[in-house]
Amino acid sequence: MANGRVVQVMGPVVDVEFDRGHLPAIYNAIKIQHKAQSAGERDIDLTVEVATHLGDNLVRTVAMSSTDGLVRGMEAVDTGAAISVPVGAITLGRVFNVLGEPIDLQELGQVDRRDPIHRKAPEFVDQATTVEILETGIKVIDLLAPYIKGGKIGLFGGAGVGKTVTIQELINNIAQEHGGISVFAGVGERTREGNDLYHEMKDAGVLPKTAMVFGQMNEPPGARLRVALTGLTMAEYFRDEEGRDVLLFVDNIFRFTQAGSEVSALLGRMPSAVGYQPTLATEMGQLQERITSTKKGSVTSIQAIYVPADDYTDPAPATTFAHLDATTNLERSIAELGIFPAVDPLASTSRALAPDIVGQEHYDVARSVQKILQRYKELQDIIAILGMDELSDDDKQVVGRARRIQRFLSQSFHVAEQFTGNPGQYVPLKETVRSFKEILEGKHDHLPEGAFLYVGTIEEAVEKAKKMA
């Protein structure tokens, strides 16, 4: 292990000088530790990661926590390896930071194995080639944009349309119905939300099946850039060593890009389009290519994607799009109608929505639902100008069914029970397809539209209509 010394501190970027022939490799972790000498000082225990070699035996590093109190001349020790984090059963039910240190005020105990956060993606020969659907119990997702085991799913939406709540519901449903292991990576989001999620999962009893890793908004960009890799490394262990199907939740993948942009600017790289880092596509690819199904198990990733100013052409969401198997688009106009989850049934897509994967019946029902909703969208201008009376009888029927379908796509969430007062619903895929098929066939045209709002199956809508009568 080589020793060096700090020669320059620029916010979260630290330059360290080493002796000739002892330069640490790129991605190596370097420890800077210093005991307080006087009452006003604080102990320093900082890990930095090597980002570039500057020449003249200097390396430029990025700090994983605050650099407050750091001064030139402090000793820095090269650990000789990349940042390594605990993996395995010891991580379940616990909350970690980017370095794999517990932040839930409990002792970690004996760590049997640590894995480096920088690893290669699985080889092509190791990857699985079959496509299997992952049932979520959320009607609009299962019907119109089904998720794939081992796939990458993007949850798109602007501020405040329900990305985090939808992610919380998915964690809950997968844990309760499938008994699956989840890893949650909180990347650059609100600490309050992370705290709420921890307590909600504890109360719901799903925490023992979940590992949580946080690098939140208040942390330096180095931590926010690497925390997604920490979570992914924990998930990969369960896939590769235990052959499990793991869910990796990333909230929010945009903050990963944003942190990369900050680090890139601090390292002095020339910015690219809209001020993003020139290495945007490479960084995203290195993360996303590790998320896949192998012959042993799978890592299915659900990533919340903040869309800056609702602009889908922004380089950050646009780069992420290229890696996704399914997209769930949350739309503000649907949220304003009071319909949650506010999923846009026409903009959300999945490559699994094909007859040879989901079956002919499911495919036909899903496409018919989209066809009716698309026709309703086209008629809205006419309705706004001339009113419903000017429509043909066929179009009036389409509008009536579309409005019922639109409301039936809403659903009460388990994680929102305390706010809404409505018990959450998990709707099996078979029930979802059957219920929508009945609406399409016109069996329930006589029921009031309000009966379809926040119910699970079609039978619940019929019961609700009786109560409303």
UniProtKB/Swiss-Prot annotation:
It catalyses: ATP + H2O + 4 H(+)(in) = ADP + phosphate + 5 H(+)(out). Its EC number is 7.1.2.2. It comes from the Bacteria. InterPro entries: AAA+_ATPase, ATP-synt_VA_C, ATP_synth_F1_bsu, ATPase_a/bsu_AS, ATPase_alpha/beta_chains, ATPase_F1/V1/A1_a/bsu_N, ATPase_F1/V1/A1_a/bsu_N_sf, ATPase_F1/V1/A1_a/bsu_nucl-bd. GO terms for cellular component: plasma membrane; proton-transporting ATP synthase complex. It is an enzyme of class 7 (translocase). It is a peripheral membrane protein. One of its GO terms (molecular function) is ATP hydrolysis activity. It is found in: Cell membrane. Disulfide bonds: none annotated. Keywords: ATP synthesis, ATP-binding, Cell membrane, CF(1), Hydrogen ion transport, Ion transport, Membrane, Nucleotide-binding, Translocase, Transport. CDD domains: ATP-synt_F1_beta_C, ATP-synt_F1_beta_N, F1-ATPase_beta_CD. NCBIfam families: atpD. Belongs to the ATPase alpha/beta chains family. F-type ATPases have 2 components, CF(1) - the catalytic core - and CF(0) - the membrane proton channel. CF(1) has five subunits: alpha(3), beta(3), gamma(1), delta(1), epsilon(1). CF(0) has three main subunits: a(1), b(2) and c(9-12). The alpha and beta chains form an alternating ring which encloses part of the gamma chain. CF(1) is attached to CF(0) by a central stalk formed by the gamma and epsilon chains, while a peripheral stalk is formed by the delta and b chains. Produces ATP from ADP in the presence of a proton gradient across the membrane. The catalytic sites are hosted primarily by the beta subunits. This is ATP synthase subunit beta. It comes from Brevibacillus brevis (strain 47 / JCM 6285 / NBRC 100599). The gene is atpD.
